[in-house]
A protein has these predicted regions:
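Glycoside hydrolase catalytic-domain context in secreted enzymes
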Residues: 1-135
Length: 135
């Protein structure tokens, strides 16, 4: 269903986003270091399948994804190499842009880690010293 909606929007000139990628289990207090632990099988079958169908079924030229606030295990999803590079880009052939969810003043979306591990753009701002590129 998502791929069809994205394709319909793209025909009208809309740049579709899939979000929140992935394991976004709760909205209440989601910025308070929500850590989600799950087996790879659970993640692939329960959390990623809908995203996979959307990515593989999209027929347009431009697509984007927004990473979620939560952590997958001990790694923020916005800096999760396995999720963003290995699965999304590698296995599924995603060629679009990946953006973080809003990075207010939470302090854990470290730009250097995000960019090195598959995010292309930081949404919002953070003036924390930890949020500077090192190279």
């Amino acid at each position: 269903m998502a791929a069809n909606e994205m394709n319909g929007a793209a025909v009208k000139g809309v740049y579709p986003y899939i979000k929140h990628f992935a394991l976004n289990d709760q909205e209440t207090n989601r910025c308070s270091f929500l850590l989600t632990f799950a087996s790879e099988q659970t993640i692939r079958e329960g959390y990623l399948k809908a995203f996979e169908l959307a990515v593989k079924g999209f027929e347009g030229n431009a697509i984007a994804a927004m990473s979620s606030f939560n952590w997958i295990g001990t790694v923020p999803s916005c800096a999760n190499n396995g999720l963003l590079n290995n699965v999304l880009r590698g296995e599924w052939g995603f060629v679009g842009m990946v953006e973080t969810d809003y990075d207010g003043s939470y302090g854990y979306m470290i730009t250097d880690h995000c960019i090195r591990n598959g995010n292309d753009l930081m949404l919002g701002f953070n003036s924390a010293e930890s949020n500077k590129l090192t190279e």
